[in-house]
């Protein structure tokens, strides 16, 4: 049964750990190449067009952006709460090396130290085989010990006859099991319910993997 979104709102932008939202609300982070469609995905998941600003300019997100979402896993259930964190996109060449290094350090600090982080959604463009940056990102996320969910976006840009092969290519390149990558299209609404089911499962999983090095 589809998740029902009760409310969603932008919380804040942060660049340093002291600025991160406080509290115990479970969090899921979203990461992918610049212009892969993160903002469109967040707007589709939160059922609020324009909540996350969509830009035609790659590399626009230069800080962590947090959004609070209340949802019901079933119509009769009490609302539950989850927080989404939009991470800066990777692979954008038109920024300085210094700026890219700053983004990388900011993201690494977040992934390593954020206690309430339950999983990371890695977003890849289904129209193309995963890039070296995508493969490296998947390996890096696994090395942190975080749970990784993969979504193949922009499926609407592909003919339906090519979608299955595109999904298999994503799963093969990222060493995923068959059916592990969620096909997604913000335009068609494809994959919204399937991805929400995995998000809700991760958000309520108290046994989610701890980050590598936690407790050391």
UniProtKB/Swiss-Prot annotation:
PANTHER family, sorted: ENGB-TYPE G DOMAIN-CONTAINING PROTEIN, MSS1/TRME-RELATED GTP-BINDING PROTEIN
Domain (EngB-type G) ranges: 24-205
Protein's name according to its UniProt entry: Probable GTP-binding protein EngB
Binding site for Mg(2+): 39, 61
Keyword match Ion transport: no
HAMAP family: GTPase_EngB (MF_00321)
UniProt lineage: Bacteria, Pseudomonadati, Myxococcota, Myxococcia, Myxococcales
GO cellular component: cytosol
Cofactor or coenzyme needed: Mg(2+)
Amino-acid positions noted as binding GTP in the UniProt annotation, renumbered to this chain: 32-39, 59-63, 86-89, 153-156, 184-186
Gene label: engB
Alphabetized UniProt keyword annotations: Cell cycle, Cell division, GTP-binding, Magnesium, Metal-binding, Nucleotide-binding, Septation
Function text: Necessary for normal cell division and for the maintenance of normal septation.
């Amino acid at each position: 049964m589809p998740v029902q979104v009760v409310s969603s709102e932008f919380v804040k932008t942060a660049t340093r750990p002291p600025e991160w939202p406080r509290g115990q609300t479970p969090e899921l982070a979203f990461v992918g190449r610049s212009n892969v469609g993160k903002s469109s995905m967040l707007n589709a998941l939160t059922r609020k067009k324009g909540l996350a600003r969509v830009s035609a300019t790659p590399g626009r997100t230069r800080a962590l952006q947090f959004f609070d979402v209340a949802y019901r896993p079933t119509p009769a259930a009490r609302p539950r709460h989850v927080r989404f964190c939009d991470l800066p996109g990777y692979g954008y060449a038109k920024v300085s090396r210094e700026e890219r290094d700053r983004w990388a350090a900011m993201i690494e600090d977040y992934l390593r130290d954020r206690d309430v982080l339950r999983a990371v959604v890695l977003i890849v463009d289904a129209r193309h085989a995963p890039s070296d940056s995508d493969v490296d990102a998947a390996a890096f996320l696994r090395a942190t010990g975080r749970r990784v969910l993969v979504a193949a976006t922009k499926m609407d840009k592909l003919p339906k006859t090519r979608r299955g092969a595109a999904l298999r290519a994503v799963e093969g390149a990222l060493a995923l099991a068959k059916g592990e990558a969620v096909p997604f299209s913000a335009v068609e609404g494809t994959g919204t319910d399937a991805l929400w089911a995995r998000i809700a499962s991760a958000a309520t999983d108290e046994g989610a993997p701890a980050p590598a090095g936690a407790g050391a």
